[in-house]
From Swiss-Prot:
Disordered as annotated region, ranges: 79-141, 240-278, 730-762, 1078-1103, 1901-1920
Protein name, entry field: TATA-binding protein-associated factor mot1
Sequence positions that bind ATP: D1383, D1384, M1385, G1386, L1387, G1388, K1389, T1390
EC number: 3.6.4.-
Superkingdom classification of source: Eukaryota
PROSITE patterns named among the record's database cross-references: HELICASE_ATP_BIND_1 (PS51192), HELICASE_CTER (PS51194)
Known role: Regulates transcription in association with TATA binding protein (TBP). Removes TBP from the TATA box via its ATPase activity.
Keyword Hydrolase: yes
């Protein structure tokens, strides 16, 4: 059974997001708070995930451990039992036991005895009693989840205790201490810790203790501590223990924890103690097997308990007397009780418990300390994080023991922590693993172990802190250790340790000035280190204490500041990552006034230390290669400005450099920060007024203006920036690098780590390659929008500069420039100039009115000139068009052979060229050429010329047409950008012209068609300003028209807003666009065609092509942005300021809710339906931006939306669902909408009377779930149960969305319990949620499900397993689920079915009487079975439930017609499959309660007419009975579940892809390992998915009193005649094949294939008959029959002689062995047949063929055994009389033999009168044979059943047996013992299995992807391919956020003790 804990633990690894993982980790910790006794159970489950290969999994596991440990009370042995110092001498040193046995409490508080189960109380629970819940958990825990001991001491407790104490003492003596620790020796001789491990480190999980001690021993060599720091005798003893298997040697057992459902366990491998007498070969074999077991298990539960106690296996005498060997099952009648034997209970393993004497985490910490030195970096990383969490919360108890005084425990605590600190130092010294992907190296292990150090320092005394500091200091100053070659990784680790040490213990340094001075010197030394990463960490070390340093040690800052400035001045490496860290420290220090004063004092004596000298050193880093450095420079300069009152270092050059930063920067955040920095610089420069400002910038403004308006070209023709207009920090113009220099820079970039770099060019001339793409105008590399965005920001900055310029010079200097921009032949200067003017307008200064008016008129003048005829930046495209036109004319000349005089000439110059005149080539010329000119020239061609040249001419013509289209689209884009930019600038001035049409059109065109989001958003903002201005000036008519058009544009995108008249009424529209999200707008391709101004009503025609649809998306996005900006800016006054918007949104909804649709709504002229869709669509996009003050308007709309959800139109339901989901996500009315969802929408799911209502409700829930994600958690309980019922809905669309929604919610169920209640949830909903939670718990935990009490008297006594079967059927009934009861043959499936059907009919009748609801009205149930069993069902129903009205719908058509009128009044109708197929039209008219398919595997063929007929039946509950649900392949299972729950296993195609194909491929002998793996995984997956819906019990498991069934194969050798016939047939077959090969070469492939199939089938049939009897094939048609008969006659023999049929001979012998046919005369002369009227054995003889039965009857029984009495049951017996024959055979013991065909007698019949079954023939389908043999082996059988299978050796039958074995394997894998009952079936699995259903499409895609990858990898060699497969994925840099020092410090506990 999978518990909530299991699912939470799995989420640590499988959680889709970090939020889900963290929530799961938190809730695991909360479990520890509620159940403190679960400590080791929780830790044992979580700890294995620390070794995961996945980073996020390890982090989540560490957080879970932290949550667990945090909720464990602080372990303080002296708090509860203080011990005086003088008393400690007599106490043991390890566990402190004062008695011989651990302190044990029984349940009643009495002393524990061997007769009772014990539960041990730990010190964690103080004096509280262990709860009964814990006792139940320990006693009922399943075998796979038992917690096993970490150390098993064997039977001798005293020896165990001594060894435990001895080991503890040795461990204590082996602890490292600072007094003897030599870090230099570790550095010199220690083994390096690299990134990965080899196979040599594989650990056998069954022998973990050996690995544990071996790893402990390995530390001696790894750390090179031989003889110096560990006692040799101790290590030798440990080594001896590792290698020996002595009695006292501790062993470790790690139980297997499987996340899959399968409980089948591999055979136990012998423990080391059992291996003593094994040979070397046997031991190696066991090792290999153990390694395979290790590789096969994903997660193992590790027991981390320090001690254990064994559970006693013996039971009390009371238990023995009360019938421990029996099951008691109460019956529906209170006076009945069934008593059954039960199998003996296997005693559970030892239960681990805690000891009062040991810190609870001791064992786990020891394991993690060993893992900290594991060769694999992932394991080291996980171990460090685990240690960090344990020490963080529980470090106080580390090393302490009970029985020691407080002082002694303090010493032990110090001793253990000193050992930990020494080990941490060793990791710093030896770790070499680092990630070089980011700007600076990140060393996960060194960072993580630094955090362990940080938490450990909380608990250690000061002397240990200083000792650790000295060790870390030595790692930094390695030259002091005498090392010739320093190790930068060790120095890096040392500095990391110091960084965390300082962060945690900084007060200690400030109280010891000598250590503080040493710290500063260490940092300065680190800053001078040649390694860049050491410098970076050194700078970060002082960053957290910069304020304290300034306050306490200001004098020491002087040297530090000098070093920091020197570091910045000395940057020569273009990849120096430490620069940003140095910059951060410097800016932090300089943010203090004291430091600035200190620098000023220093500057007075040393001018080189002034800011005017120092700050310019930063300027050359503004365009540094590394992003982090550029970001830090901007941040530092901003900090400097904010703290300085006088910034003398700020000049005009400073502003220009900031401007250039904006112009060239590609990173969005740095660009924005640069704008802010430039604004601050501008403000400082403007302090002395406009005149001073202008003077400072006079020499800079012109180049800034010129460079900012550089046109943006295309990838065909870029326009580079004029580098002479860009200056370096020195003030010199930027000199572009030569090609040689660029190549050098590129080669340097390729070296990610360069420790020693030669001197570069002098400062100021160094050329960084980061800006080359921007400088070169490389649009293809940078992207046109990114480049434009930078230019626009620069232009806005220039506008603000002009706004501060000297007033009388603004127009004089800047108007000509701006006029040139607006009249430029390029489009870019127009856009940028307009933006500059707009920015100028935004400067608030009344003195600028005249200048603004002048520039406004300039805009008005230029606005009239747009659009222009052409743009210079499109000249290159026009040249391309001209070249293509010229090629077309040349084709007419060369290919068409026209004379040159007839061909027109083209102008050489194109429009836009500098020398172009009025007759220059333009796009109109090109259009004319491919139009009338082309037609005229074609007419001049002769027919032969046309034939020769038409193809070439058409190709070039269409090329020209394409180029024209490209040019026109580009031209239109430039027109829109220019007109929108000018119009937006005009609107900003707040002075609207009288005529607004052109302005509105310019901005609206940009909103509709602009592809660049920055321009579209700007136009949206301008339109918002325009609307606001119109309302201010009382021009509402204009603004209302604009708003209505915007609303119409929002709805133009038919992918988001459907067309009302195109949508039908049935179905769910979301299923047609389930992959469409609301956030896919970025994928718009941008091919624009539509340029109409008006909103077209005919959307379908205007949006027909792909490009038109993309244009509609752009329209929708632009209009959406505008409305959203309006909502954000207008706030709560939105609807009062823009009342027309309120009308568009709410009026259509209100009208529909009040009166519905008018009758003419379906007419094309009626727009009511479309208006409603549009209103909901707009509200959907707008609601998230509405102010919370508008909540009342939105809440009042919710009831209207509820009405639309129940609309008859699918489009209305679709939009209502999306709109409702959007409201649930909004702040305005989200909680109210969710309340409505629970109260009103969810009940619609259960409306059986209306499919429309269910479709609307499920569509709404689907969209809410998809939108809210994790935020749906508080409401998940209201949804999960209703969705579960709808997953088997009669409507396919409802099923699909219910399953999809369920699959999304099911992953969140484990997280629900730990969440607080929403603050605004009404009390009645809270109460309802508690009921739902209780309901869900019953479903998830089968132990909490109440046993189903059968409310009707059943005339039979149910066995225990039958009652459990009825419970399972009741469970399905309760949750509206359906299933397969596939118990073994003979276990009473019929009886269990009758019980649930009768009970449900009774319950429905009772509910109908109480409520009168039509939902519970009487409806009959239908039993469909094979015709043979129809009578059997009638008999069983009349026997067990005589109160049910049963109608048998069987017989000829006339009789059936009479019964039809009675069927609806009957309780149960029994019919056959044949009748169901023929009369399906009558049966589908009735709604059935239960539809039961007996032997339901007959519908295995999904395409059969019978199957389709059965699946068309309608019923509330569906049940299949089948002892063999899978007979040949798993595809049959799909057909069965397609009847039960259509869609549950996906479509047949996806099922084939996911399951059938991989399983079939894995059978192939040539299959690869990956294919075999896929096959295995597919079998496991299908098993997991169908598990909860299939109940399977085997007779041997549930019937202890059922005698055994013995199956024996009886081999027969072929007779001479058979062998001769076989050889002749094979020879003839080979000859025929040769002849056919020659003939079929002339025939078609399909005919050949069909003939071959028929040929093979005939051959198989021939050989099958030959195995049975030669007479079966030697018919009258056989060509050799006469010759063989004559030959036999000569030998006095015949075809029917038994010697020719060895099977009949063997059958006769078997019958005689059974005592049949042995007629003889005894001594009294009396025939023995008369003496023994009844034989001891009775026999069933099965054959496949009726002809074979005839031969058995005539040739054997009648001819040679006349005294054997027999009956016969085959197809010749009428179905209605077959049950009568069965009854007669069972009741008359004088009948010796029953002859049957497998087809007729092998299904459903009870033939327990026989005890011997003989198969003369065998079925290809093994399940048919199994069913046949179980006719005798079933309930009621008192004798051992012997089954004999007659097999002809060396022939086809042996192959049939082999095929049967494979099919049995597949069937047993899918349906196995996990389907045994509610407890093992795991009803909770319902919440897991639908993940597969929801993701099936993705799975198919993954399979295809894997196959394509396999195909791609086939070209690689074996080694290369393995290496490629072994490469892990790159991890995300955001994972390193956990190494943030500030975040770490914030998590440290406030109180360490």
């Amino acid at each position: 059974m999978t518990t909530r804990l299991d699912r939470l633990v799995v989420l640590l690894d499988s959680g889709s997001t970090s939020v889900v993982r963290e929530t799961a980790a938190k809730q695991i910790g909360d479990i520890q708070k509620v159940h403190p006794d679960e400590l080791y159970n929780l830790l044992g489950r979580v700890v294995p995930y620390l070794k995961s290969k996945n980073w996020d999994t390890r982090v989540a596991a560490a957080k879970a451990i932290g949550g667990i440990v945090e909720n464990v009370p602080v372990w303080n042995p002296n708090r509860t039992s203080p011990v005086k110092k003088e008393e400690t001498e007599d106490l043991p040193s390890f566990n402190g036991d004062t008695e011989e046995k651990p302190f044990i409490k029984t349940e009643e508080g009495a002393p524990a005895s061997s007769q009772s189960q014990v539960v041990v109380s730990s010190n964690l629970t103080s004096n509280s009693e262990v709860s009964k819940l814990e006792e139940e958990r320990l006693s009922t825990r399943s075998h796979s989840q038992e917690i096993k001991p970490i150390v098993d001491f064997g039977p001798d407790e005293e020896t165990a205790k001594e060894l435990n104490t001895e080991l503890k003492g040795k461990f204590e003596n082996s602890l490292l201490s600072f007094e003897s620790f030599d870090i230099a020796n570790v550095l010199k001789a220690g083994k390096k810790l690299l990134g990965s491990a080899s196979r040599d480190y594989d650990v056998n999980p069954a022998n973990y203790s050996t690995h544990y001690l071996q790893q402990l021993s390995n530390l001696k060599s790894r750390l090179d501590l031989a003889g110096e720091y560990l006692d040799d005798s101790i290590m030798n003893d440990l080594g001896d223990n590792v290698g020996s298997n002595s009695k006292g040697s501790p062993t470790t057992s790690i139980p297997e924890h499987k996340t899959s459902i399968n409980n089948n366990k591999p055979e136990d491998t012998p423990t080391p103690s059992e291996n003593v007498h094994l040979s070397a070969r046997q031991r190696n074999a066991l090792k290999r097997k153990a390694r395979q077991m290790k590789n096969s298990q994903k997660v193992r539960v590790i027991d981390v308990a320090p001690t254990l106690v064994h559970q006693q296996n013996s039971t009390s005498s009371a238990d023995k007397k009360t019938g421990a060997d029996y099951n008691f099952t109460a019956q529906s009648r209170s006076d009945r009780l069934v008593v059954e034997h039960k199998a003996p209970i296997v005693p559970s393993a030892a239960v681990a418990v805690t000891s009062d004497s040991v810190w609870p985490f001791e064992t786990l910490v020891e394991l993690l300390l060993i893992d900290m030195f594991d060769p694999s970096w992932e394991i080291r990383h996980g171990a460090c994080m685990g240690l960090r969490e344990i020490i963080r919360y529980a470090g106080f108890g580390y090393g302490r023991v009970v029985g020691k005084s407080e002082a002694e425990n303090e010493q032990l605590n110090k001793k253990y922590f000193d050992d930990l600190l020494c080990r941490i130092a060793c990791v710093f010294a030896l770790d070499r693993f680092g990630d070089y992907l980011a700007d600076q190296v990140v060393a996960p292990i060194r960072e993580s172990v630094s955090q362990v150090l940080g938490v450990a320092l909380i608990y250690v005394p000061n002397d240990s802190v200083f000792s650790m500091y000295k060790v870390l200091h030595s790692l930094v100053f390695q030259n002091e250790l005498g090392l010739t070659n320093t190790v930068w990784e060790a120095a890096h680790g040392g500095m990391l340790g110091i960084k965390y040490l300082v962060a945690v213990k900084y007060p200690l340094f400030f109280s010891h000035s000598d250590y503080l001075d040493s710290l500063i010197n260490t940092v300065i030394h680190g800053l001078a280190n040649h390694d860049d990463d050491v410098r970076a960490v050194s700078a970060l070390t002082l960053l957290p204490i910069a304020d304290k340093l300034v306050q306490e040690k200001l004098s020491s800052c002087k040297n530090l500041l000098k070093v920091l400035w020197d570091c910045l001045d000395d940057v020569k490496d273009d990849l120096s990552s430490s620069t940003s860290c140095v910059m951060d420290l410097l800016s932090s220090l300089c943010s203090f006034t004291e430091v600035m004063n200190l620098m000023q004092e220093t500057a007075n004596s040393d001018p080189e230390f002034s800011f005017e000298t120092l700050v310019p050193r930063l300027f050359h880093l503004m365009r540094y290669t590394l992003t982090g450095v550029r970001r830090s420079v901007v941040y530092a300069l901003t900090k400097f400005i904010s703290v300085q009152t006088s910034c003398s270092w700020i000049t005009g050059l400073t502003l220009r450099l900031c401007f250039q930063n904006v112009l060239l920067e590609q990173q969005e955040d740095i660009s924005k920060s640069s704008c802010e920095l430039a604004q601050r610089v501008m403000d400082i420069l403007y302090r002395d007024g406009p005149e001073s400002f202008s003077k400072l910038l006079y020499s800079h403004i012109e180049p800034m203006l010129k460079v900012s308006i550089t046109p943006i070209g295309s990838f065909r023709r870029p326009y580079p920036l004029d580098t002479t207009l860009i200056v370096k920090p020195s003030g010199q113009p930027y000199a572009p690098s030569t090609s040689r220099e660029r190549n050098n820079n590129i080669s340097e970039l390729s070296n990610s780590r360069t420790k020693h770099r030669a001197k570069d060019d002098p400062k100021g001339s160094f050329c960084f390659s980061v800006d080359e793409p921007m400088l070169n105008g490389d649009v293809e590399f940078v992207g046109e929008e990114r480049m434009l965005k930078a230019r626009l920001r620069a232009s806005s900055l220039l506008g603000r500069i002009i706004g501060r310029w000297k007033r009388d010079e603004i127009l004089l200097f800047f108007k000509p420039f701006l006029q040139a921009c607006l009249t430029s032949s390029f489009s870019t200067p127009v856009v940028l100039g307009s933006r500059l003017i707009e920015s100028f307008f935004e400067v608030e200064d009344n003195d600028l009115t005249i200048q603004k008016d002048e520039l406004y008129h300039l805009l008005c003048d230029q606005f009239a000139t747009v659009p222009r005829e052409n743009y210079a930046n499109l000249v290159s495209q026009l040249h391309v068009v001209r070249a293509q036109c010229n090629a077309l004319l040349n084709t007419f000349l060369d290919v068409g052979r026209l004379s040159r005089s007839k061909i027109p000439s083209l102008a050489v110059v194109v429009k836009g060229d500098p020398e172009a005149g009025p007759i220059a080539f333009g796009i109109a010329d090109a259009e004319k050429l491919v139009g009338p000119t082309y037609e005229n020239l074609c007419k001049l061609l002769s027919p032969s010329q046309k034939a020769q040249s038409s193809k070439a001419l058409n190709e070039i013509k269409y090329l020209i047409i394409d180029e024209i289209s490209i040019y026109k689209i580009a031209k239109e884009r430039q027109d829109i950008q220019c007109s929108a930019s000018i119009a937006s600038a005009m609107v900003t001035y707040d002075k609207l012209p009288k005529k607004l049409n052109s302005i509105i059109k310019g901005i609206m065109e940009s909103i509709k068609k602009e592809q660049f989001s920055c321009l579209q958003m700007h136009s949206a903002s301008a339109m918002m300003k325009l609307i606001s201005a119109c309302y201010k000036e009382s021009r509402q008519v204009i603004s209302e028209k604009i708003v209505r058009n915007l609303c119409a544009y929002v709805c133009m995108d038919t992918t988001e807003t459907p067309i009302f008249h195109d949508s039908g009424k049935n179905g769910i529209l979301s299923l047609h666009s389930i992959g469409t999200s609301d956030d896919n707008d970025e994928q718009v391709s941008g091919k624009l065609v539509d340029d109409s101004d008006d909103v077209s009503n005919d959307r379908k025609s205007s949006l027909s092509s792909v490009s038109d649809k993309d244009a509609a998306v752009l329209q929708r996005m632009g209009a959406q942005l505008t409305l959203q900006q309006m909502a954000q800016n207008f706030g709560s006054s939105l609807f009062s300021r823009v009342p027309v918007l309120s009308q568009c949104l709410f009026v259509p909804l209100q009208q529909y809710a009040e009166s519905g649709f008018p009758s003419e709504v379906d007419q094309a002229s009626c727009t009511v339906g479309q208006d409603l869709l549009d209103a909901m669509s707009i509200l959907r996009f707008l609601v998230a931006y509405l102010d919370s003050g508008l909540q009342s308007e939105i809440v009042s709309t919710l009831p209207h939306l509820l009405a639309t959800l129940q609309s008859n139109y699918s489009a209305v339901r679709n939009m209502a669902s999306k709109c409702f989901a959007a409201i649930t996500e909004s702040n305005a009315a989200g909680s109210k909408a969710l309340h409505l969802l629970v109260e009103d929408v969810v009940p619609l799911l259960g409306d059986a009377s209306s499919t429309i209502h269910r479709q609307g409700a499920i569509e709404c829930i689907y969209h809410v779930v998809q939108r809210l994600g994790v935020r749906i958690l508080p409401y998940i309980l209201y949804l999960i149960i209703p969705l579960l019922g709808r997953m088997s809905d009669a409507d396919q669309d409802v099923r699909v969305l219910a399953t999809t929604s369920f699959a999304t919610l099911v992953k969140l169920v484990p997280l629900e319990a730990g969440l607080p209640d929403p603050p605004d949830l009404p009390q009645y909903l809270l109460d309802s949620r508690e009921k739902e939670r209780k309901f869900l718990e019953q479903m998830l935990n089968p132990s909490k499900v109440e046993a189903f009490s059968i409310p009707v008297p059943i005339s039979a006594d149910l066995r225990k397993y039958q009652q459990e079967g009825v419970n399972w059927l009741a469970f399905l009934n309760k949750y509206e689920l359906h299933g397969i009861l596939c118990d073994d043959m003979g276990l009473g499936k019929t009886l269990q079915t009758i019980c649930i059907v009768a009970s449900d009919h009774y319950n429905r009748q009772k509910l109908f009487e109480e409520s009168g609801s039509p939902k519970f009205a009487h409806v009959p149930s239908l039993i469909v079975c094979p015709s043979t069993l129809a009578g059997h069902w009638q008999q069983e129903l009349s026997t067990y439930a005589p109160f049910l009205k049963v109608s048998a719908y069987v017989g000829p058509p006339a009789e059936r017609a009479k019964i039809r009128s009675k069927m609806k009044k009957s309780d149960v109708v029994v019919t056959s499959y044949d009748i169901c197929r023929n009369d399906v039209d009558e049966l589908v008219k009735i709604d059935w309660n239960y539809c039961v398919l007996d032997e339901g595997h007959v519908i295995k063929n999904a395409r059969a007419k019978l199957t389709k007929a059965v699946k068309s039946l309608r019923s509330y509950h569906r049940l299949i009975l089948s002892g063999t649900p899978i007979q040949n392949n798993v595809l049959e299972l799909w057909s069965l579940f397609d009847f039960l729950m259509p869609g549950f296993l996906g479509t047949e195609k996806t099922f084939q892809e996911r399951f059938v194909r991989p399983i079939a491929a894995s059978r192939d002998a040539k299959s690869s390992s990956k294919e075999r793996e896929r096959g295995t995984l597919a079998l496991e997956a299908i098993h997991k998915q169908v598990l909860p819906f299939m109940l399977r019990r085997l007779k041997e498991d549930v019937l202890a009193d059922l005698p055994p069934k013995i199956i024996q194969d009886y081999y027969c050798d072929m007779s001479d005649l058979q062998r001769k016939l076989l050889n002749d047939f094979v020879s003839q077959l080979n000859i025929n094949e040769e002849l056919e090969d020659d003939e079929t070469e002339k025939t078609q492939g399909t005919r050949k294939k069909k003939s071959q199939k028929a040929h093979i089938f005939q051959a198989l049939q021939y050989m099958r008959k030959l195995c049975n009897h030669p007479a079966l094939i030697l018919t009258e048609k056989h060509p050799k029959r006469n010759a063989i008969v004559k030959q036999l006659a000569k030998e006095n023999s015949g075809l029917h002689d038994l010697k020719h049929a060895p099977k009949l001979t063997a059958l006769g012998q078997l019958l005689r062995d059974c005592g049949l046919g042995n007629s003889s005369v005894n001594s009294n002369g009396i025939d023995s047949a008369l003496t023994n009227a009844v034989s001891e054995h009775r026999v069933l003889i099965f054959c496949q063929l009726k002809d074979m039965l005839d031969m058995v009857e005539k040739d054997l029984l009648q001819a040679t055994m006349p005294d054997v009495t027999y009956m016969r049951l085959d197809g010749s017996v009428e179905p209605t009389k077959r049950q009568e024959a069965v009854t007669k055979f069972n009741n008359d013991p004088s009948i010796d033999v029953l002859l049957l065909t497998t087809h007729v007698g092998g299904l459903g019949l009870n033939l327990t009168g026989a005890d011997t079954v003989i198969f003369v023939e065998h079925d290809w389908n093994p399940m048919r044979d199994l069913q046949a043999m179980d006719r005798a082996h079933r309930i009621g059988q008192k004798k051992v059943v012997n089954v004999y299978r007659l097999i002809t050796r060396g022939c086809l039958e042996e192959k049939i047996m082999g095929l049967q074995r494979f099919k049995m394997n597949v069937a047993s894998t899918v349906v196995n013992q996990q389907n045994a009952g509610l407890s093992s079936i795991g009803t909770d699995q319902i919440l897991d299995l639908f993940n597969t259903t929801a993701d099936e499409q993705q799975t198919v895609q993954n399979i295809d992807k894997e196959e394509s990858e396999d195909a791609a990898g086939r070209g690689l060699s074996g080694t290369s391919k393995k290496a490629l497969e072994g490469l892990p994925e790159m991890w995300d840099e955001s994972q390193y956020d956990e190494f943030n020092l500030d975040g770490f410090i914030s998590t440290l506990p406030k109180d360490a003790s």
